[in-house]
Amino acid sequence: MRRAVCPGSFDPIHNGHLEVIARAAGLFDEVIVAISTNYAKKYRFSLDERLEMARETLASLKGIVVEPVGEGLLAEYCRQRGVSAIVKGLRSSSDFDYELPMATMNRQLSGVETVFLPAEAHYIHLSSTLIKEVAGLGGNVSEYVPRSVLRRLLAGEPSANQQPRR
């Protein structure tokens, strides 16, 4: 079985993520959407909320598993799960410059390859951070996120992990 992992914090998951994951599902037998938590970052949504949103929005795709990645190296996670490839979406050359050293290190540590999928043109500008900022200021982000994510964004209840506004 060809198994890949699409890692990320997905805070929140958006249509750019979904497009890359759907394309990965066409390339691999199983794609693990591994949701990470970096304790140095502040999140709008808790890990449980991010897992729930991903599961809701990816339920119709075959061969997708959503799970928390836990602590530790992604390379070790890949080795434990029998993953042959890490799939990363690229929006720009700066994404590539950021991802290439990590891809090289992951290959050296575990032998796992990284597959880069360029984002579709209409998603190049999307980031979870931008979506949260625009939604927080009352902007319409409905064409960029699934309905279940939009509902949570509009609810306006911050997760316990969110950094307080000044």
Curated annotation (Swiss-Prot):
Coiled-coil region: none
Cofactor field: Mg(2+)
Residues that bind substrate: S9, K41, L74, K88
Positions annotated to bind ATP: S9, F10, H17, G89, L90, R91, E99, Y123, I124, H125, L126, S127, S128, T129
Location, primary (coarse class): cytoplasm
Gene Ontology terms for molecular function: ATP binding; pantetheine-phosphate adenylyltransferase activity
Protein localization: Cytoplasm
GO biological-process terms attached to the record: coenzyme A biosynthetic process
UniProt entry tagged with the keyword Cytoplasm: yes
Positions bearing the site annotation: Transition state stabilizer: H17
Catalytic activity: (R)-4'-phosphopantetheine + ATP + H(+) = 3'-dephospho-CoA + diphosphate
Role played: Reversibly transfers an adenylyl group from ATP to 4'-phosphopantetheine, yielding dephospho-CoA (dPCoA) and pyrophosphate.
Family to which this protein belongs: Belongs to the bacterial CoaD family.
Subunit structure: Homohexamer.
Record-given protein name: Phosphopantetheine adenylyltransferase
Naturally occurring in which organism (per UniProt): Pseudarthrobacter chlorophenolicus (strain ATCC 700700 / DSM 12829 / CIP 107037 / JCM 12360 / KCTC 9906 / NCIMB 13794 / A6)
Gene name for this UniProt entry: coaD
